[in-house]
UniProtKB/Swiss-Prot annotation:
SUPFAM superfamilies: Fibronectin type III (SSF49265), Growth factor receptor domain (SSF57184), L domain-like (SSF52058), Protein kinase-like (PK-like) (SSF56112). This is Insulin-like receptor. It comes from Aedes aegypti. Residues 1338-1348 have a biased composition (Acidic residues). It is found in: Membrane.
Length: 1393
C-alpha cells in the first residue's frame, strides 16, 4: 500500500546558474530556517521536531536510544524538505520505527564530511525497522554504509550501494532479516509513472566481478524501485531516469526543468530567499561548506556543535576572508579586531608572524593547536608524560618548528620522549618577560633522556637559566647557552655537576602522606610541609610519583630507566605553602585499580638534602562496567543456554549479570506482500559487494589462514574471510559506536571566565551510587499461553539456562545482557569514597530464533472436509481444513496435493493457495476432474519451511449416467419454459390492470408488517436511564447522551445515546419512531449500531442506542480537515489512508450483514454512518430501511424525499432499491471519505445530478486518490446493477489491509457469511462506458444538511448550493446543460495527500 506520505511531498526546487550569474524568478522561496546545524535526537520522538523546516543539515543527524515507543509514535513526523546531510546519518536502538520513508522521503545526498568510523550511514540494532525506504537517496559522497543487527529489516541487499558510494568504499551489511522470508522486489514500481504513462521498471543490478549467474532486481521496498541514473549523468537524474544538469545537480531534479536541482553539486546561494546553484560564489559572498553566504551571515555563523566544549573559541568564530568563511586566518595573515569587535584577516607586509597565546604542551593534540605559530605571546611549557610515540619528535617538528619568539619563559619538564630541543628549529629569542619559574626564563627539569638543547644559538632576554636533574644532559651543553648569553646567570650553577649529567644519590628524609578521598578516576593525596632545610627558599617544590600496582610489589626505580616506556607517572607541585599541608589531586586514573604512590621534594641544597615518602597503595572507586562480550545463545535438547564473556573492564566487584529476554513477535506485514506460490524457490540474496568489514591494515596469520582468506567465494556466497578478524572488526566498530552514543554530560561552567577546577566538581557531595535501571524487570507470560513475553533473571555466572518451554517455538527473541557491580567500600574511615558512576553497564543485544517444533505445522486431520460438488457440466471437489493452531511462525501458503489412485503412473498435482486467499475461502476448489478414485493431502508452509502433508483422504467421483442426464436436462428445460410463460403472463396482467388501481409495497416479513408497537423484552424502565447533555438533532427529535444503569435485570453503568421524539409529533410519527426500533431489534453484529432498549410506556418515547462518541462520519471527516478551525493547537490530523481503508471495510461488513438479513438501507451516506470512541465505523439511522425478505427490490412511491446524490440510476429512474443500489451508494461514501466529506457532484443542481446519473455519468477521481481505491468506486458505480460487486466481494478485496481486530469481530468471518459467500455466483465485472464528472468548480455557498435529500414527486427538486472550498469542482460534462462559467480549481483537501 502506497504510503500517504508520497502524496504530501514538498520538494524545494533549486535552480542552476553558472559562475556568479544571478537569474531571478527561477524557483520558489526556501522556508525560513532551511539550513540547520547538527541534530541529536535521543530518548523521545518528540525531539524530531528539531528537523522541522530543515532543507540542509550542515553536520550530522543522530537518532538514538528511543525506547518503549511504537510505530504510531512516528506517524506525525515527516521532513520532506530535507534533501542533504553534509556529514553522516546515525540510527541506533530506535524502537517502533519501521521505515525511514516517512521521515526522509526526499533525502538525496549524504556528503560524509565527517564519518562514524568509516561510514556515512549507520543503522544499528533497530528492533522493528522493516525497510530503509530512503527512496530519493542517490549519492553518498564519502564513506560507506553499515547496516547491522536489525532482525526485521528487509530490502537491505536489494540496493546497489556501490552505485551511491565512491569506488573502493567498503559497505557492511549483516545480521538482518533473512531474504527468503522477505518480500521480493517488484518488476515495476507502483508509485512512479513514466512520462509515457507506463510504470517505472525496477533495474537489474550490474554484474561485477564476473558473477553472471547472480542477478538481482534493485528496489527500496515492494513499491519503489531504486533509481539508477544513465551513464551520462551519474547520480543526477529524476526518479523516472531523465538526466538532470549533471554539471550542477546532484541527487536529482524537478521536472520538467532539468536545471531545477534537488541538491547543488558544487555551491548554492540564497539571494532574496531564492536558492540557486552556482559553480563559484558571486562577488561579496563567501564560500561556507557547500553554500555561499553574505558577510553578515558569515559573522553570524555559530561554532559547530562538536566544538561547543571548547571555551577558548568564541560563539561566533567565523571570519569572511578572500571569498571563504573561515574560523582562522590563513598563513601570512594576522587577525585584526576592531574597536567594534569586527574581526578580519590582514595580510602582512613581508613575513607575517602568526601570534598565539601561551600554551602547555602535554600531548600531540595540544601541540597541533600551535601549528604555524611564530610568536608566542606568553610562555611555552612542554611536559610530555606519555610513554610512547615513535614519531613524536617528527610531530613536534611539524607543529612547533615555525616558532621564532617566546615572550615569556620556556619550561621543559619531565618529557621522557625528548632527546633534544632541536624541534624548535626557528626559535631565536626567549624574552623572559612577565612571571617566571624560579626567576628563570629557561627552565629545564627532570628530563630523563634529554641529551641536547638547541642546534643553533638562542638569545635569552631576561631572567636566569635553571637546569635540574637532567641525568643525560651534560653541563657543557648548558654552559654553551650561557656562553652565548654572557649576561645571563645560572640559578643553581653550583649544583650543575651534581644533578645534571649524573645520577648522584641524595640525603633523603621521610615524608608522611595520607589519602583523603578517592573517586573512580581521581584521588586526593595530602602531606605535611617539608621543614628540614635550613633555608626554606631551597625547597623548589614536590613531585608525586604514581603507578598501577596490581600486586603491591613495586620499587622506587620501576620504569625509571631511559629505555622503558612503562613506568612511574609523575606530577610536580610548585604552588605550596610552607605553613600548611599540601594537597594534590591525581586525575585520569582507571576505575577500581590499585595504584602505588610516593612523594619527593625538589631542593637546592648543596648537600643533596631532600624528602621522600614510603610507597603506599590505594584502590580507586568502582566505575561503570563495560559491556559483556561474545554473547551466544544455543539450544540443547529441552534447555536454552545463554553464554557470554565477562566485560574487558569490570571496574568493580561483580554483583550479577542481568539477563532480560523479550519476545519480538513476527508481526511483519511485509511478509504477506510476497507471493510464496510464485517465489517459492527464491534463495537469500547474495550481495555482490563484500558485506564484511575490511581486514586490519596489519595482521599476522598462518599460511593456511592466508590461503583461506584468499579463496574465491563459495557457492553460498561466503567470502572465505577469517571469522576471528571479522569478529574483531565488529567489536571495534561497536566500541566506536558506543563512544558516539553514550556521552557524559559536560560539567556546567562559565564559558567567559576560566577558573580553577573545584574539588566539589570532581568529588560531589552526593555520593549515592547510581544505577542505569533501564532494564525492565518484568517476568510475564503471554496471555492464555504457557510461554513468556518477558523473562528477567540475574546470575553470577557467565551463562544461564532456561527450560525451552519458556519460549514459543520458532519465534524471535531479543536477549539483553549487562553486567552490574557492587558499591565501593572506603579503604579506611578517614578516607572518603566517591561512588557516583553507574552500577550497571550498557546492554548488549543478541537476537535469536528458537528452534522449530516438529508437527506444529501439520494440518489437523480431523478438520479436513471433502465435499464433491459435481454437476452436469463439470466435476469438482471442495476441500476445506483448519490451519495449524500454533505453527512455526506465520503461515505463508498451503499446498493441496491430489492424485488418481485407481490408475498407475499418474503423478500428483499440486495446487498452491496463498494464506491471504485461504483467509477468504478457508479451502480450495479442485476443478476439471475426471471420474475416478482420488487421494487428497494438505500441507502448510510457514517461514520455517514446509510442514508434513496430512494423511491421505479418499473420494470417489462416479461416472455420469448419460440417459439420466438427458432426462434431467429435458425436464429442466420444460420447467423453465412453463415458468417463463407464467412469469410473463403475471407481469403483463400486473402492469396492465393492477398498476392502474394501486401502487403496491411488498412487505413480506410478518415482523415488519405490523403498525402497532408491542411491548416486549426490549422494554426498559424509565428510572433506569440518566439523561445527560445534548448530542444533536436526530431524525425524529433531540438525541442526548446518557447512562443506562440497569439492562435486562443486570446492573450496569453503560454510556448510551437516548433518541427522543418531538413533543409535537403525531401518533403516526411516534409509530414510525418505534418502527425504527423494531427494525434494530433484528440486528446483532459489530458493525451495525446496536439497540439497547426502548421506553414506549409514557411520554416521551425513548429509544436507547449504543453510544457513538465521535458522531456521524460526515461531521468527523470535516472536523479533521487540515485547516478546520476548532480552537485547538494543533489541529486534528486527517485520517491516514490505512484508517480510511479500515473505515471502508467496516462499513462494507455492516452492509453485508444487512444484505444477508435481506434488508436494503436506501440511504447509505457518510451522515448515516456513526464513529465510535475507538474509531470503529458502524451503520446507523434506519429511518428509511426496508425489509425485503422474499423480494429482490423495493419500489418507492412518488412522494417524499430522496438522497439523489447517493442514489443509483435504477433508483432515480424507476424507484427500484436493492442491495446493488446500496453498493452504488457505498461508492459515493468512499468518495466522501477520500475528499473529507465534500459534497458529491459538486457544482450540479439536484435536477442535473438526476439526469447526469441516469445518463451514465460518474464522478472524477478525487485529487491524490490511489488507483485501487478509485477503481473500487468505479466498480460500485457500474450502470448495470448486476455488474457491481457484492459487499462480500468488497470485503474480500479490502481484507489484506484490515486490522487484526477486524478478523475477530467481523460478520464476514461468521458461518452465515461463509454460507452466503459460497452461494454467490462469480460475476465478471466489466467497466462500462460511463462518463466521468470532469473537475471544474463554482463559487456557491455551503449547503445545509437537508440539501442531501431532495423532494421528489410532489415536492420540487430544488437547486442545491455547492460545497465550501474543500469541494469537488463543477462538471464539464456534455450530458449537463448550462453548467455556468469555469473557474480555477481551488484547494480540495484529501486525506490521501
Amino acid at each position: 500500500m502506497v504510503s500517504l506520505l508520497l502524496f504530501s511531498i514538498l520538494v524545494v526546487p533549486v535552480a542552476v546558474v553558472q559562475g556568479d550569474e544571478m537569474k531571478a524568478g527561477q524557483v520558489g522561496p526556501v522556508p525560513k530556517g532551511g539550513v540547520c546545524g547538527s541534530v541529536d535526537v535521543r530518548n523521545s520522538p518528540a525531539h524530531l521536531d528539531r528537523l522541522k523546516d530543515c532543507v540542509v543539515v550542515e553536520g550530522f543527524v543522530h537518532i538514538l536510544l528511543i525506547d518503549k515507543y511504537i510505530d504510531s509514535s512516528f506517524e506525525n513526523y515527516s521532513f520532506p524538505l530535507l534533501t542533504e546531510i553534509t556529514e553522516y546519518l546515525l540510527l541506533f536502538r530506535v524502537n517502533g520505527l519501521k521505515s525511514l520513508r516517512r521521515l526522509f522521503p526526499n533525502l538525496a545526498v549524504i556528503r560524509g564530511d565527517a564519518l562514524v568510523g568509516d561510514y556515512a550511514m549507520v543503522i544499528y540494532e533497530l528492533m522493528h525497522i522493516e525497510e530503509i525506504g530512503l527512496i530519493s537517496l542517490m549519492d553518498i559522497t564519502r564513506g560507506g554504509v553499515r547496516i547491522e543487527k536489525n532482525p526485521k529489516l528487509c530490502f537491505a541487499n536489494t540496493i546497489d550501494w556501490k552505485a551511491m558510494t565512491v569506488p573502493g568504499t567498503n559497505n557492511y551489511i549483516k545480521d538482518n532479516q533473512k531474504d527468503n522470508v522477505c518480500p521480493i522486489c517488484p518488476a515495476e514500481s507502483t508509485a512512479v509513472m513514466l512520462p509515457n504513462g507506463s510504470k517505472q521498471k525496477c533495474p537489474a543490478a550490474p554484474v561485477r566481478g564476473g558473477n553472471k549467474d547472480h542477478k538481482r532486481t534493485l528496489c527500496w521496498n515492494a513499491n519503489h524501485c531504486q533509481t539508477i541514473c544513465p551513464p551520462e549523468c551519474p547520480k543526477a537524474c529524476s526518479k523516472t531516469g531523465v538526466c538532470c544538469d549533471a554539471e550542477s545537480c546532484l541527487g536529482g531534479c524537478n521536472l520538467p526543468n532539468t536545471s531545477s536541482c534537488s541538491v547543488c553539486r558544487h555551491l548554492s546561494i540564497d539571494p532574496a530567499g531564492k536558492r540557486q546553484c552556482v559553480a563559484k560564489c558571486p562577488p561579496n559572498t563567501f564560500k561556507y561548506h557547500t553554500r555561499c553566504v553574505t558577510r553578515d551571515e558569515c559573522y553570524a555563523m555559530k561554532k559547530p556543535i562538536s566544538l561547543d566544549s571548547n571555551p577558548d573559541l568564541p560563539d561566533q568564530p567565523f571570519i569572511p576572508h578572500n571569498g571563504s568563511c573561515l574560523m582562522e586566518c590563513p598563513l601570512d595573515h594576522e587577525l585584526i579586531t576592531e574597536l567594534n569587535k569586527t574581526r578580519w584577516c590582514r595580510k602582512c607586509s613581508g613575513t607575517c608572524p602568526k601570534r598565539c597565546e601561551g600554551s602547555n604542551i602535554d600531548n600531540i593534540q595540544s601541540a597541533q593547536l600551535l601549528k604555524g605559530c611564530e610568536i608566542i605571546d606568553g610562555s611555552l611549557e612542554i611536559q610530555l608524560r606519555s610513554r610512547g610515540g615513535e614519531n613524536i619528535v617528527k610531530e613536534l617538528e611539524n607543529f612547533l618548528s615555525s616558532i621564532t619568539e617566546i615572550k615569556g619563559y620556556l619550561k621543559v619538564v619531565r618529557s621522557y620522549p625528548l632527546l633534544s630541543l632541536g624541534f624548535l628549529k626557528k626559535l631565536k629569542i626567549i624574552h623572559g618577560k612577565g612571571n617566571k619559574v624560579s626567576n628563570s626564563s629557561l627552565y629545564v627539569v627532570e628530563n630523563q633522556n634529554l641529551q641536547e638543547l638547541f642546534d643553533h644559538n638562542v638569545t635569552i632576554g631576561e631572567g636566569k637559566l635553571f637546569f635540574f636533574n637532567n641525568p643525560m644532559l651534560c653541563t657543557d651543553r648548558i654552559k654553551a647557552v650561557k656562553k652565548y648569553n654572557p649576561g645571563i646567570e645560572i640559578e643553581n650553577e653550583s649544583q650543575l655537576e651534581s644533578n645534571n649529567g649524573d645520577r648522584a644519590a641524595c640525603s633523603i628524609t621521610e615524608l608522611e602522606t595520607s589519602l583523603k578521598s578517592i573517586g573512580s578516576e581521581t584521588a586526593i593525596i595530602q602531606w605535611a610541609p617539608f621543614t628540614e632545610l635550613s633555608d626554606a627558599r631551597m625547597l623548589l617544590g614536590y613531585v608525586i610519583y604514581y603507578i598501577e600496582a596490581p600486586y603491591a610489589n613495586v620499587t622506587f626505580f620501576d620504569g625509571r630507566d631511559a629505555c622503558n616506556t612503562e613506568g612511574w607517572r609523575l606530577d610536580d607541585i610548585s604552588d605550596f605553602n610552607m605553613d600548611k599541608e599540601t594537597t594534590k589531586i591525581l586525575t585520569q586514573l582507571k576505575p577500581y585499580t590499585q595504584y602505588a604512590y610516593y612523594v619527593k621534594t625538589y631542593t637546592l641544597g648543596s648537600e643533596g638534602l631532600g624528602g621522600q615518602s614510603k610507597i603506599k597503595y590505594f584502590t580507586t572507586a568502582p566505575g561503570t562496567p563495560s559491556v559483556v562480550r561474545d554473547v551466544e545463545v544455543s539450544v540443547n535438547k529441552n534447555m536454552l543456554t545463554v553464554k557470554w564473556l565477562p566485560p574487558l573492564k569490570m571496574n568493580g566487584r561483580l554483583k550479577e549479570y542481568e539477563v532480560f529476554i523479550e519476545l519480538n513477535a513476527d508481526d511483519n506485514e511485509q511478509l504477506m506482500l510476497r507471493d510464496y506460490c510464485e517465489d517459492d524457490k527464491l534463495r537469500d540474496i547474495v550481495p555482490e559487494t563484500p558485506t564484511s568489514a575490511p581486514p586490519p591494515k596489519t595482521s599476522i596469520c598462518t599460511a593456511d589462514q592466508c590461503r583461506n582468506y584468499c579463496k574465491a567465494p563459495t557457492s553460498g556466497g561466503s567470502t572465505g574471510t577469517i571469522d576471528v578478524t571479522d569478529k574483531e572488526n565488529q567489536i571495534t566498530f561497536e566500541d566506536q559506536l558506543h563512544n558516539y552514543v553514550y556521552i557524559k554530560n559536560p560539567l556546567l561552567r562559565d564559558k567567559t571566565t576560566r577558573r580553577k577546577r573545584s574539588t566539589n566538581l570532581l568529588f560531589p557531595n552526593n555520593t549515592e551510587n547510581k544505577k542505569n535501571d533501564t532494564t525492565d524487570r518484568r517476568t510475564e507470560k503471554v496471555k492464555d499461553e504457557p510461554y513468556y513475553q518477558y523473562i528477567f533473571n540475574a546470575t553470577n555466572e557467565t551463562s544461564i539456562t532456561f527450560p525451552l518451554s519458556y519460549f514459543n517455538h520458532y519465534s524471535l527473541y531479543v536477549f539483553k545482557i549487562r553486567a552490574c557491580r557492587h558499591p565501593g567500600d572506603p579503604p579506611a574511615p578517614s578516607v572518603r569514597l566517591v561512588d557516583v558512576e553507574l552500577a550497571c553497564g550498557n546492554e548488549v543485544f543478541e537476537n535469536f530464533r528458537t528452534p522449530k517444533k516438529e508437527g506444529a505445522d501439520d494440518i489437523p486431520p480431523e478438520s479436513i472436509l471433502i465435499e464433491e460438488q459435481s454437476n452436469n457440466t463439470q466435476r469438482q471437489i471442495r476441500v476445506q481444513w483448519k490451519e495449524p493452531s500454533k505453527p512455526n511462525g506465520p503461515i505463508v501458503k498451503f499446498v493441496v496435493k491430489y492424485q488418481r489412485v485407481d490408475l498407475e503412473s499418474v503423478s500428483s498435482t499440486d495446487i498452491c493457495i496463498r494464506y491471504s486467499s485461504f483467509n477468504q475461502t478457508r479451502g480450495a476448489l479442485l476443478t476439471k476432474l475426471e471420474p475416478g478414485n482420488y487421494s487428497i493431502r494438505v500441507m502448510a508452509t510457514t517461514i520455517a519451511g514446509d510442514g508434513a502433508p496430512s494423511a491421505a483422504r479418499y473420494v470417489l467421483i462416479a461416472k455420469d449416467d448419460s440417459m439420466g442426464t438427458t432426462l434431467i436436462w429435458l425436464g429442466t428445460l420444460i420447467v423453465i419454459f412453463l415458468c417463463s410463460v407464467g412469469f410473463v403472463a403475471f407481469y403483463w396482467y400486473k402492469y396492465r390492470y393492477m398498476s392502474k388501481q394501486i401502487r403496491m409495497y411488498p412487505e413480506v416479513n410478518p415482523d415488519y408488517a405490523g403498525v402497532q408497537y408491542k411491548v416486549d423484552d426490549w422494554e426498559v424502565e424509565r428510572n433506569h436511564i440518566i439523561q445527560l447533555e445534548e448530542l444533536g438533532q436526530g431524525s425524529f427529535g433531540m438525541v442526548y447522551k446518557g447512562i443506562l444503569t440497569q439492562l435486562r435485570g443486570e446492573k450496569c453503568n453503560q454510556p448510551c445515546a437516548i433518541k427522543t421524539v418531538n413533543e409535537s409529533a403525531t401518533a403516526r410519527e411516534k409509530d414510525s419512531f418505534l418502527l425504527e426500533a423494531s427494525v434494530m431489534k433484528q440486528f446483532n453484529t459489530h458493525h451495525v449500531v446496536r439497540l439497547l432498549g426502548v421506553v414506549s410506556q409514557g411520554d416521551p418515547t425513548l429509544v436507547i442506542m449504543e453510544l457513538m462518541a465521535n458522531g456521524d462520519l460526515k461531521s468527523y471527516l470535516r472536523r479533521h480537515r487540515p485547516d478546520y478551525e476548532n480552537g485547538e493547537d494543533p489541529s486534528p490530523q486527517p485520517p491516514t489512508l490505512r484508517q480510511i481503508i479500515q473505515m471502508a471495510i467496516e462499513i462494507a461488513d455492516g452492509m453485508a450483514y444487512l444484505s444477508a438479513k435481506k434488508f436494503v438501507h436506501r440511504d447509505l451516506a457518510a451522515r448515516n454512518c456513526m464513529v465510535a470512541d475507538d474509531m470503529t465505523v458502524k451503520i446507523g439511522d434506519f429511518g428509511m430501511t426496508r425489509d425485503i425478505y422474499e423480494t429482490d427490490y423495493y419500489r418507492k412511491g412518488t412522494k417524499g424525499f430522496l438522497p439523489v446524490r447517493w442514489m443509483a440510476p435504477e433508483s432515480l429512474k424507476d424507484g427500484i432499491f436493492s442491495s446493488s443500489s446500496d453498493v452504488f451508494s457505498y461508492g459515493v461514501v468512499l468518495w466522501e471519505m477520500a475528499t473529507l466529506a465534500s459534497q458529491p457532484y459538486q457544482g450540479l443542481t439536484n435536477d442535473q445530478v438526476l439526469r447526469y446519473v441516469i445518463d451514465g455519468g460518474v464522478m472524477e477521481r478525487p485529487e491524490n486518490c490511489p488507483d485501487n481505491l478509485y477503481n473500487l468506486m468505479r466498480r460500485c458505480w457500474q450502470h448495470r446493477p448486476t455488474a457491481r460487486p457484492t459487499f462480500m466481494e468488497i470485503i474480500s478485496e479490502l481484507l489484506p489491509d484490515a486490522s487484526p481486530h477486524f478478523q475477530d469481530v467481523a460478520f464476514y468471518n461468521s458461518q452465515d457469511a461463509l454460507d452466503m459467500l459460497r452461494g454467490q455466483h462469480q460475476t465478471v465485472i466489466i467497466d462500462e462506458a460511463t462518463t466521468p464528472l470532469r473537475p471544474g468548480d463554482d463559487h456557491d455557498e455551503e449547503p445545509g444538511e437537508d440539501d442531501d435529500l431532495v423532494g421528489h414527486g410532489e415536492g420540487h427538486i430544488g437547486d442545491v448550493g455547492t460545497d465550501d472550498e474543500f469541494s469537488m469542482e463543477m462538471t464539464n460534462s456534455h450530458l449537463v446543460r448550462n453548467n455556468g462559467p469555469m473557474a480555477t480549481i481551488r484547494s480540495p483537501h484529501s486525506p490521501l495527500r
